[in-house]
Amino acid sequence: MKSYKIGIIGLGYVGFPLACLFAKKYPTVGYDPYQERVVRLSEGVDVTNEISTEVIQARLSTHLRCTANPNELRDCNVYIVAVPTPIDLYQQPDLTALREASSTVGSLLKQGDIVIYESTVYPGVTEEVCVPILEQTAGLTFNRDFYVGYSPERINPGDKQHTVENICKITSGSTPEIAREIDALYNSVLTGGTYLASSIKVAEAAKVIENAQRDVNIAFMNEIAKIFNILDIDTNAVIDAASSKWNFLPFRPGLVGGHCIGVDPYYLIQKAKLHGVSPRLMMEARKTNDSMGGYIAYQIINQLCLRGLPVKDSRVLLLGFTFKENCPDTRNTKVIDIYRTLQHFTDNITVYDPFANAERVAEEYGLTLTTEPAQLPTDNDVVVLCVPHQCILQTDVYQYLKPEGIIYDVKGKLPLSERIYRL
């Protein structure tokens, strides 16, 4: 039986849980170019909160080693690339990290090695972008000297129920034999099983439509929420009623941020445009979802006016800043759109999030984040429950309000009252 030594490139939300998973059975080297990240992991601290200290220490004491030195990957025979694939300022795919990772792996490749990509991309990237870099850097021939596969990540940050170990993973390979080998490798560490796709492009396409479909469905609900707000109908009550039908899909309106659903559709949109197709539904869904932060802010202003509360220089408390609940990730958070729109009316805005890193928020978004509840003002005109972290839901939100103040509940998590408004 073939013995494997696994190299994981990228130790973020995707790569590190994957490294811990493979290290249960195989010698595994986790590589990340950021020394600070490697140091914290080696100390047993995962700042993404995906893996517990106990699990990290258990893996480090057996098969796992973390490093910022790519040369320590040299003895590996399977390389798994799990680096970010964001978009640029023009909403175009940014493959910089993927190209750099491919170049790093290419400098290490040996005869018979396998390179597996997990990063979300448009169909064709693995074979048309990554493989040429591997060939050129390694001086080896694709599908003769080395092979590639694609197994798209399905990490849901903050979700302790659906983990990398117990969800079904799509696998694929550059030859039928390699595809079966990659599938067997993943199956050897997963409890949720695998789905062997017929080609790498099929696997790439499957991943990108998973997130694009969710984006479209949420956009529909956001549009519905805007309509029902005008008609003075409770959107969540409508969804609850409609959910009594067996095949109704109970998506909820809200903010769509983060590094997956709010980003990945642009990869398929760009690929479609290159081939002369204008994917209007996906593009409109993106516009709708990207508009929701500003829309919510103006809904808040409207409610302040209707209640006779001050708008100019009003005191506002935003609860939650990360892109989703129970997760420290602030990348592409749409709470910033609420904040910046409200800034046109008042400078008295406090932003609270116990999960987020205050220094990173200040550096990326230029705002001061409060992480301690004891520091929060209690005389706010409006409290906006932006991100319903469990710890926030367990507190009395009313304690932060003036007697006549209002609450805007973005995701509809609080019981309705005459002082609560929501999408």
Task: State where each predicted segment sits.
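Structural/interface elements that position substrates and couple domains in central-metabolism enzymes
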Residues: 1-423
